[in-house]
Amino acid sequence: MQKKYVVALDQGTTSSRAIVFDHDANIVSVSQREFTQLYPNPGWVEHDPMEIWASQSSVLVEALARAGIHSDEVAAIGITNQRETTVIWEKATGKPIYNAIVWQCRRSAEICEQLKAQGLEEYVRENTGLLLDPYFSGTKIKWILDNVPNAREQADRGELLFGTIDTWLVWKLTEGKVHVTDPTNAARTLLFNIHSLTWDNKLLEALDIPLSMLPDVKPSCSVYGTTRIAGEGSEIQVAGMAGDQQAALFGQLCVEPGMAKNTYGTGCFLLMNTGTKAVRSNHGLLTTVAVGPKGEVNYALEGSVFMGGATIQWLRDELGLIRDASDTEYFASKVADTNGVYLVPAFVGLGAPYWDPNARGALFGLTRGANRNHIIRAALESIAYQSKDLLDAMIKDSGVSLKRLKVDGGAVANDFLMQFQADITDVEVLRPSVCETTALGAAFLAGLAVGFWESVIELEHKACIDKHFIPNIDAQTRVQLYAGWQDAVARTRT
């Protein structure tokens, strides 16, 4: 039977999805299932790895069944995943020894402080591109080994395996035959040397993690093994995987140096491909691994905004100014400007490039004439201002002058926000027709790995732009608006 489809498994923080794409990169079928969030202590976040697998395997079956697709018609399954989340299981039984510790979890902060006290902060920055933070997997692994009964002894005997979610899914799909990750996920563990592209023995020793626990690192665009849907039908190749933000970068076909994408979700994630050069940031950005045009390792600069769509949720849930996120465009467009109002949504501090955990949110410029529309508009503009902060930092670090910014995520449906993003950055903003770019990136990697598609050049002909947003304000206005934002940010930090 002819191979007509590629399936992307998109394993996220709150839900598991399966999306079926045809040869023209159109979405044929989608299935999604949420799973339980566990908060056993303040600042702790966990998932049940078996529930993740159950949700992911069930949506795979559902997505194919809904479209009447037989396993014979599927060329490959690709994977993209929430990054950093940590699973440890028994090699012999496949049984997790503890819940998955989620990327958001802060329980290993003390371990990070111990590593800093050992003078490892600069070594980590130089060799992994990351900061010493509980966000990343390495300290989560150590916490499990130190706190779960018998875990340390089992690890020393070579009986335990570690994986981020991509590794866990491949292990389950291949029925325990394959223990593998890719460079984009390995680069988020705090254990991977992004220059030699190998596990770092010094960091493994510092965290007392046996090398035997770690997966093999295979290219993001390659075949890892085979699976059967619900144990039945023809074997399907499991091929191609990347962490969610790198998958989105590839899904947007940002495969050349200087190409960048911004994902507008609860927060914002801005990544710029820097090619074969790992650029070290002097502005608080992370250096990470990306995927090049032939599936090879490229590098990227990454910055994140803590409060993107979450700012709009605040307007709705806490202030009651809107009923639905989509209302913001209507209200913001009813006024010509914010009437001098700036909202700095530093509700949990400020991320890159400021990294100020003590900053707090504030509204500035309120006068008697300020109304709901001005505040809503200021909230939308704050998302664009924070993204400009990141973009300016990337341009300074990379020395590349950006001309176009590709965008994805839920908030890109807001035309006002996208136009203001173009205006304040003086960069053309491109919104794709298919905004499921994370899943699309996994599908592209899988399809390229098995020859379903021949090259990135072929994929470029399938990538359709829904709308171009062209900068439409003069330079003086842009400078004045941004100066007002910078002043507001400075005042939240004093």
UniProtKB/Swiss-Prot annotation:
Inhibited by fructose 1,6-bisphosphate (FBP). One of its GO terms (cellular component) is cytosol. InterPro entries: ATPase_NBD, Carb_kinase_FGGY, Carb_kinase_FGGY_CS, FGGY_C, FGGY_N, Glycerol_kin. ADP binds at T13, R17, T266, G309, G410, N414. Its EC number is 2.7.1.30. Pathway: Polyol metabolism; glycerol degradation via glycerol kinase pathway; sn-glycerol 3-phosphate from glycerol: step 1/1. It is an enzyme of class 2 (transferase). ATP binds at T13, T14, S15, T266, G309, Q313, G410. Glycerol binds at R83, E84, Y135, D244, Q245. Key enzyme in the regulation of glycerol uptake and metabolism. Catalyzes the phosphorylation of glycerol to yield sn-glycerol 3-phosphate. Belongs to the FGGY kinase family. NCBIfam families: glycerol_kin (TIGR01311), PRK00047.1 (NF000756). This is Glycerol kinase. It comes from Shewanella sp. (strain W3-18-1).
